[in-house]
């Protein structure tokens, strides 16, 4: 039997061990036919698999198949899902500083909002809110508008007493200031609630109106830009820590700003297409002039109220809001927006 030379033996001994393949599941609540499934989540799946050289296998589960939307963050934290994409505000009170990006008037595109939110996260200002998971990226959608079943809303008086679905408690505060009655529910519940008349309307960006077929249950669409929603794609901490160094490097390389921007740009494209689809069958109402000033004053009161609540709890609400404003300015300059 031939003997190995000393050099060959040393070379074999020092070769890195081939990392074993790891299978990860990725849960989200958007429909299987949504643009997010193909352009964001499956694209991320392919990127990670390619980056890892096949050492990581990702399977994406859409449409709440691994858990309800409201449990998304908890499912990632507890290992029910290895990775989950969810809305921070679905876990009320858990992400008070992150939800500052939801406040009205901070930005007018998902790309800029996502850039600013990721910068805020990267600064370490939000570390305490995510200490029990491993965050991949954060982002926002574009401006959210008001969509109503039968009532044309063009004044604050029109909105008085209407039962309006709010995505989060922060946006509920805004609706209260506007005179509406906020009703909490995740986005997948909107279609049925509106069809049954349980709610009179709902808050959604144009992109999501089309994505959840909500244009089928609302005839009137009031464009104002009330809010933006905060999202996070995050990973079970134990699952991440169990990866090999090479596998961690692959995950890390497909995390952060690049994917925040990818998500934001996708939402901006979705808003253009969603608005076109929605207005093909619905009526657009825009808030202008003196009436707009009244709505903006109500939005400003909601912002002041939320930040005051955080400051009173000893949280840096006002400081974080000002940081977001600074990041928005940076992102607009960097992105040419």
For each predicted feature, which ranges?
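N-terminal secretory/targeting leader peptides
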Residues: 20-112, 121, 128-337
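Bacterial N-terminal signal peptides that target proteins for export
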Residues: 1-6
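Expand to "…catalyze enediolate/carbanion chemistry for C-C bond making/breaking, isomerization
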Residues: 10
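N-terminal signal peptide c-region/cleavage motif recognized by signal peptidases
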Residues: 14-19
């Amino acid at each position: 039997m031939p003997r190995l030379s000393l050099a060959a033996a040393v070379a074999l001994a020092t070769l890195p061990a081939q990392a074993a393949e790891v299978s990860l599941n990725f849960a989200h609540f958007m429909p299987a036919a949504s643009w997010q499934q193909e352009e964001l989540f499956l694209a991320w799946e392919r990127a990670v698999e390619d980056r890892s050289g096949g050492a990581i296998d990702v399977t994406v589960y859409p449409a709440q198949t691994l858990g309800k939307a409201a449990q998304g963050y908890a499912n990632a934290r507890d290992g029910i899902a290895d990775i989950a994409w969810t809305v921070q505000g679905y876990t009320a009170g858990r992400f008070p500083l992150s939800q500052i990006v939801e406040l009205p008037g901070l930005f007018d595109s998902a790309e800029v909002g996502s850039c600013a939110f990721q910068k805020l996260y990267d600064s370490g200002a939000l570390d305490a809110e995510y200490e029990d998971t491993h965050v991949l990226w954060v982002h926002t959608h574009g401006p959210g508008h008001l969509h109503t079943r039968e009532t044309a809303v063009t004044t604050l008086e029109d909105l008085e007493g209407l039962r309006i679905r709010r995505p989060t408690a922060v946006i509920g505060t805004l609706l209260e200031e506007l005179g509406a009655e906020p009703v909490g529910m995740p986005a997948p519940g909107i279609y049925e609630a509106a069809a049954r008349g349980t709610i009179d309307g709902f808050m959604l960006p144009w992109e999501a109106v089309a994505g959840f077929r909500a244009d089928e249950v609302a005839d009137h669409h009031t464009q104002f830009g009330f809010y933006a929603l905060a999202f996070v794609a995050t990973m079970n901490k134990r699952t991440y820590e169990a990866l090999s160094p090479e596998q961690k490097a692959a995950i890390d390389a497909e995390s952060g700003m690049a994917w925040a921007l990818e998500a934001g740009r996708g939402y901006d494209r979705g808003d253009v297409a969603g608005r076109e689809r929605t207005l093909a069958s619905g009526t657009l109402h825009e808030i202008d002039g003196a009436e707009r000033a009244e709505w903006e004053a109500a939005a400003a009161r909601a912002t002041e109220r939320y930040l005051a609540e955080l400051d009173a709890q000893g949280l840096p609400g006002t400081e974080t809001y000002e940081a977001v404003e600074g990041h928005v300015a940076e992102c607009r300059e960097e992105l040419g927006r």
